[in-house]
Every structure is written in structure tokens, then in C-alpha cells.
Amino acid sequence: MRIAVLGGTGSFGKAMAGRFAELGEYDIVIGSRDAERAQATADELGGGRVSGATNEDAVRGSDLVVLAVKADAALDTARGVAGALGTTPVLSVATAIEFAKGVGMLPDPDARSLAERTADVVAGPVIAGLHSIAAANLDEAAPDEDTLVCGDDAAAKELVLELAGKLVAGRALDAGPLASARALEGMTAVIVNLNRRYKAHAGIRISGLPDG
């Protein structure tokens, strides 16, 4: 399986690509506007099955594309690769958080999620997830937390659930349709505020669910 990580030179994208690379099961392509920078990041992660390319070249032939760029660049990046992307599934991990007096919040709580807006500009299914995981946690090992995934396409969501489950020590849980991304992105703002207040890298755990 080939996974393209757009924004793979950033903190979260690089950490995610590194964790997938450590599993040794996937071909990882770091995508960036700057191919040389992407390749430098790939080399830093150990090379081998990790390579670097422009965003457009990274998505070609990939089985999953992770949109890990900053929130304010996500839609433009998605538009820029839409032609090369075709109907390949996209995993949206970004949240548009703004800070006012040190408190993080969504710019417009009543607006559609970034994941939903991404679905407007690409032909393939968009899945949202992994919002609550801190890059610092992925840098070290599988964090002791759960992660939530949502989307409307069953096959694409199952693929992301399988992959996400390999990144955390807890569980990757199906949180419903893509519309649930509004809640997931909002919850991320709360987690960011908690981590800033307590100087931590906390995640979430969902209790009371049956095993399996």
C-alpha cells in the first residue's frame, strides 16, 4: 500500500509518516510544495520505503492521501491536487483553530467542518480522524489513547480505521458520518486548551464500549 502524506514536512505529518515507516508495511511518500524539502524529510526518516515528491506527484498512484497541511492551506492544497488525485480516499486531520487571549476555538462553531469542505473540492471520499493526537505523542511511540474516525464511505473509513488503529495503543473508533467531523474538530479545540493549560500532550479515552 502507498500512502501520500501532504504536509509531511510539518510536525504532525512528519510524525505520522515516521510512525507508518516504522511499521515497515507501507510505501510512504512525503508531499510538499518543495520536492527537495520533501526528500530531505524522507531521508531524515530513514529513506528506504519513504520518499519525497511534490504534492501532485505524491498523490499519483497512492491508495490513501493524508491531508496534513495547516488548516488555512488545506482547501487550496486539495484543489491543487484534485486532478491527480482522482477518486483516491483523503484523510483530513486538520482543524481550523483560532486563538483569542490564549484560548483556542473554532472560527465559526456553526460552520461546516474543514473535512466537509474538503469533500466539496475532491472527487473521492473524505474521511476525518486523528484530530486529538498530538504530534509529540506520535513522535515517541503508539500513544495510550483512542482516536475517532468519521466518514460517509464505508470502505474508505474501514481502511482509515485499520491504519489509525496501528498508530495508537488504544482503539480507532467509528464515530459515524462525515458530519460528525464538526464535533471532532470542535473537541480538538478543547483538547488543545487542556494541553496548553496543563502543559501536557493529553488525548482521549472512550470508556464503556464493548471490546472488539
Predicted feature descriptions by range:
Residues 1-44:
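NAD(P)+-binding Rossmann beta1-loop-alpha1 motif at the extreme N-terminus of oxidoreductases
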Residues 5-6, 67, 149:
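Hydrophobic Val/Ile/Leu positions in short beta-strands of Rossmann-like dinucleotide-binding domains
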Residues 24, 45-48, 86, 122, ...:
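Short, structured coil segments at secondary-structure junctions
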Residues 49, 55-89, 98:
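Rossmann-like NAD(P)-binding element
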Residues 52, 126-130, 172-175:
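General beta-strand structural signal in soluble alpha/beta enzymes
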Residues 94-134:
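Rossmann-fold NAD(P)-binding glycine/threonine-rich loop
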Residues 137, 145-212:
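Active-site-lining helix/loop region of Rossmann-like oxidoreductase modules
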